[in-house]
Amino acid sequence: MTTRPFIVIDLDNTFVDYTTAFKECLEQIGYDGYADAPDPSDYSFACEGWFDNVRTQPVLHRRAVGLGLYLRERPYPHAPEALDDLRHGGFRIVLATSRYDDQEDTDRWLCGMGFEGGRLDDLAECNTDFATIVRDRWTARLGWCHMSDKTALGADLTIEDNPHTLDRLMDKKMRVLVKRHAYNLPQCERAEQSGLGLSFDDWTQVPALAKRLVEENAK
């Protein structure tokens, strides 16, 4: 483990509320009836209360991005405070997202919300492997980057909601802290039963759970 433990935090539906912002965009587009839609039970949004097939959400997502979807997202309650606790608790933090369609919106959002984070994407121009640079050479306490394969970052702990990403992380015996949703309940159970992680509903739980998992990882 690194001298200062390294934590990767996902953005959409982990640190920030994607689903609510997506609903707002759907209403603007003219798709009424989703304001009270439940937490989706499938990551594809092809489930009760949402869409009939897996092809619908990607199309509407692209339209929503054009309407400023990522700029509309808000942190979950207590998430910024938990982030501050982790940063000041000696952890290196990188916000890692797979949203490659955001242009400059993520950068603008972080600036607008007052998160003074370094954009790490420019380091990809170096000859050294990008993931290695982020993992081993980033010494500031907060950074952010685009990263489709979060297992490559080799974090001491990854805070995540995507069931597919969670499975890949756990397949590699990497520690996870799962933001619980209806669509990732099997991963919550897997994390806890395997001893590779825990799950949470409220960000007030995160600092203590993260410290516990990192300490267990160090043993």
Task: Give residue ranges: language-model regions.
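Substrate-recognition "cap/lid" segment bordering the active-site pocket of phosphatases
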Residues: A96-M170
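Acidic, Mg2+-coordinating phosphoryl-transfer loop and its flanking beta/alpha structural elements
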Residues: L157-D201
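Short hydrophobic/aromatic-enriched beta-strand-loop microsegments
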Residues: Y34, G117-D122, K173-H181
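Anion (oxyanion) recognition and catalysis
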Residues: E27, D84-R87, M170
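Charged phosphate-binding loop/patch that engages nucleotide di/tri-phosphates or the phosphate backbone
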Residues: S194-K219
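Short, acidic loop-to-helix structural element flanking the phosphoryl-transfer center
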Residues: L67-L95, D101-D107
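Active-site neighborhood of HAD-like aspartate-dependent phosphohydrolases
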Residues: T2-T56
